[in-house]
Amino acid sequence: MTADGVEQLRKPEEKMQICSFLWVYYGFPTSCYEGRNVEEVRFTSGLKMGQNDDSEVDCACGIPDSGVGMALGYAEGKGVPYHRAISKYTPTWPRSFMPNSQKERNHVAKMKMVPVHDLIEGKRLLFVDDSIVRGTQLGETVRFLYEKIGRAHV
């Protein structure tokens, strides 16, 4: 691309290959890729997990944001309620996979998730999270639940 115009160096391939990362993790819920809505794919994935899981749980919870759609599907498939046991506070925190050091990533993961203690204590919770980049958010959330709340089964 120059000020004089655009030149195509190579034609695109006939067959597209799209990254599934868009549906599971990075895609915005209203986006569609190859005719499939992101939120629908997440919900359906969770639904199938719930239908096939024999764990005994009191409720399903999603780790915001991309885990929520899957957790809603899981809850429906399993026949258990969905509880918003973790709220996300993001005005000052980036995505937890973005900082350069693991120490910073752990700090971001810990600070941006706020638990609702009354929905967690003494419950058998099933959390759904994508955690496909580094697993930092899920690891920090589970560690927090065990260390600070103590009476949750995760």
Q: Language-model features: where?
A:
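PRPP-associated nucleotide enzymes
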Residues: 1-151
